[in-house]
Amino acid sequence: KSVDDMMKASGSSASKYLEDDVLTGYVVSSDEGGNIYKNISLVDDSGKGFNISLDRYDNYTSYEPGRKVYIKLNNLYTQVDFGALEIGDLYNNTQIGRIPEIIIGDHLLRSCEVVDEETLVNKISISDISDKYLHTLIEFDNVQFKDNEIGGNYYSSSKDLGGATNRIIVDELGYEVIVRTSSYSDFANNPLPTGKGKIRGVLTRFNTCLL
């Protein structure tokens, strides 16, 4: 199965998947630095991204970036949420929740194959971002934090929104995108860098905001 196949078979509410199908993905996220919590982002063979919710910490120890993973879909739940495929267990009757730790190994099977992260990253401009890149690894070059952000840290308790801080980066043409940092991130208290450079991360969406 592909992500496109799964999205066609899924709706806006969580539904149980009953077929004995397997979805293959390559991990593009890591919770090692504390900025991702109980989620894994992957891409299928076509490069389409999707997300799996797992009720476990330190998922990077088993499902590190570049690791090929086989997802046995039978009896899991799927949903299209904010324009992207979500896979997990059932929560609150209609939503995707986290797969219980005790059965994660039954559904997520590690391959011996690990590919270089460079083969998975999409090097794009901020103006290129769209739902097609959701839950994929993206990289922007020649970007910087907005002038009014400089002097602060990645995370600020005075700008806390749901346990994280949104900062804005801008490119040479004035296009902007949000960089979201959790209070639990290893770099939460690091000062924002000055000057231009590269930034790499996983694209997600919350309501109308891509971040």
Go through each PLM region and give its residues.
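OB-fold nucleic-acid-binding modules
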Residues: K1-L211
